[in-house]
Amino acid sequence: MSYKLLIINPGSTSTKIGVYENEKELFEETLRHTNEEIKRYETIYDQFQFRKDVILNILKEKNFDITTLSAIVGRGGMLKPVEGGTYAVNDAMIEDLKVGVQGPHASNLGGIIAKSIGDELNIPSFIVDPVVTDELDDVARLSGVPELPRKSKFHALNQKAVAKRYGKDSGKGYENLNLIVVHMGGGVSVGAHKQGKVVDVNNALDGDGPFSPERAGTVPVGDLIKMCFSGQYTESEVYTKVVGKGGFVGYLNTNDVKGVIDNMEAGDKDCEKIYKAFLYQITKTIGEMAAALNGKVDQILLTGGIAYSPTLVPDLKSNVEWIAPVTVYPGEDELLALAQGAIRVLDGEEKAKIY
């Protein structure tokens, strides 16, 4: 069957849209929003009509007939924790997206805009593998402090997309494999995928795991507590040290990993030190996830923007190939991953889940 899909991926200052015919991209646009435009709205939900109009206007400009669409797919937002998969957007989901039950985030608008356009056209609307995807084993939820359970916050959409792609490419099927998926971008998430479920993963936003271009990962917690009560920092300043100004930004004042590697190869010792620590921490976390899978690992998958690195990828491979063979799927194509999630449902390969 042939399907035409409109894909909507809202970010804080832009909305990315794509129109796909099955897995073929017909066109893609990044609609940028100025600070002035965004500032007009008090809450993220208040931006709904503005962003929807911008999307419909660009489709009109391109003379695209929206009545030819089969479904609308939005980026999944900060809902209650759910298991991975493709979800039909329903009223319960819309209510939770409006308030952002796990926090305000532009991606909350994805499902809201998708349902609004879908309902007008009388076609289904979906979200796919939202960032709150949570399939953790119960043992992985305990942190050691009862009030602070471990949370599943990771690059669920891309991790699931490459894991399913490898399942197809290998002919074995995602549900029959044990995989370790390593997403390396602005944050780094390392997930243990056990027969179709992410049973353990580091909280790549503000929890634990390797440091990344902009995030701190696991830090010495006693010292962090002292920092919080030193009187020198506000709460948001400490948070920014962990998310935004951690990792490469903290040490080298840049989030450009490629530039750091170039400098290292030109003899910069500071860059070499940070690069080696970065490589070491990712290696160690892969080892941790191999242990979570009891050493039964079929394949390690590397993905995200940093997986394009001609230096880091061979270095990482040589560190972890003793665990399992390594396959590289560089970059991240969120629009395609969202399209594929909808196609699996429209084709009857998967059932749409109900929120």
Curated annotation (Swiss-Prot):
Gene Ontology terms: biological process:
acetate metabolic process
- Does the entry feature the keyword Ribonucleoprotein, yes or no? no
Its Enzyme Commission number(s) read 2.7.2.7
Any one GO cellular component localisation term in the record: cytoplasm
The protein's predominant localisation is cytoplasm
InterPro entries per UniProt: Aliphatic_acid_kin_short-chain (IPR000890), Aliphatic_acid_kinase_CS (IPR023865), ATPase_NBD (IPR043129), Butyrate_kin (IPR011245)
What Pfam families does the record tag this protein with? Acetate_kinase
The top EC class, named as a word, is transferase
Where is it located?
Cytoplasm
Molecular functions per Gene Ontology = acetate kinase activity; ATP binding; butyrate kinase activity
Name the chemical reaction catalysed here.
Answer: butanoate + ATP = butanoyl phosphate + ADP
User: Which top-level group of life is the source organism from?
Assistant: Bacteria
Q: Which UniProt keywords apply?
A: ATP-binding, Cytoplasm, Kinase, Nucleotide-binding, Transferase
Is rRNA-binding included in the keywords of this UniProt record?
Answer: no
Family listed: Belongs to the acetokinase family.
The protein's name is Probable butyrate kinase
**Gene name as annotated:** buk
